[in-house]
Structures are given as C-alpha cells and as structure tokens.
Swiss-Prot record:
HAMAP family: ClpS. Gene3D superfamilies: 3.30.1390.10. This is ATP-dependent Clp protease adapter protein ClpS. InterPro entries: ClpS, ClpS_core, Ribosomal_bL12_C/ClpS-like. Binds to the N-terminal domain of the chaperone ClpA. SUPFAM superfamilies: ClpS-like. It comes from Paramagnetospirillum magneticum (strain ATCC 700264 / AMB-1) (Magnetospirillum magneticum). Involved in the modulation of the specificity of the ClpAP-mediated ATP-dependent protein degradation. Belongs to the ClpS family. Residues 1-34 are annotated as: Disordered. GO terms for biological process: protein catabolic process; proteolysis. It comes from the Bacteria.
C-alpha cells in the first residue's frame, strides 16, 4: 500500500500550478501610442513707418510663398491694422521664418518686425 500524497500544488513535471497559469499562451495586443498633433504658431508681421511696402511684399512672396496678390493683401492689412498673419506653422518652422525675415530686413536696413504667437 502506498502512502497517500498530499497535494502540494506541483504538477507531475514539477512546475508550480498555484499561480493560476494553466500553461496556455495568450495574445498580447500592442496598442499604438496616440500621437498628438503639434501645436501651431502664427507668424505675425508688425507695421512700422519705415519699411517700404514693396519690401514687405517681397518678403511675403519669398518666405511665405504668397502670390503677388496675396502678398499685397497681407501687406495692406498690416499697414492699415498694425499687424497681420503671414502664415501658421509648427514652432520650428515659424521660428525659422521669423529669423529669415528679420535677417533680410536687417541686411537691407529696415526695422521690419515679425513675431510668433501660439494659435
């Protein structure tokens, strides 16, 4: 007669079964991290009494890819209202455009100013 064995939670092969693992495999579902859209920034041009209107139109055409008509419209808006939107971009692009405008204005000895504002 064999002695009665106590249940130890061990399977025949010695693996511990007490943790609820029945040896079956499961499927791991990978979720894609949600990507957040970057914040957008307006590049604003400020009016001054010294920068020639034609220079402002040139800047808008060159750095903001405006047509002559659109550039003239923005320039007149800046001239009459004191400030106008040149375009809306991600921060890095907006910052680059402001730097390009300010550098060209300085090279041509114009006090033209541009700033960035979060949309």
């Amino acid at each position: 007669m064999q002695p009665r064995s106590k249940h130890t939670g061990m399977s025949e092969n010695g693996n511990d079964k007490r943790d609820g693992d029945d040896g079956q495999t499961g499927v791991v579902i990978k979720t894609r991290p949600k990507t957040k859209k970057p914040s957008m920034y307006k590049v604003l041009m400020l009016n001054d009494d010294y920068t020639p209107m034609e220079f402002v139109v040139h800047v808008l055409e060159r750095f903001f890819n405006k047509s002559r008509e659109d550039a003239t419209r923005v320039m007149l808006h800046v001239h009459t209202r004191g400030v106008g939107i040149c375009g809306v971009y991600t921060y890095e692009v907006a910052e680059t455009k402001v730097t390009q405008v300010m550098d060209l204005a300085r090279q041509n000895q114009h006090p033209l100013q541009c700033t960035i504002e979060k949309e």
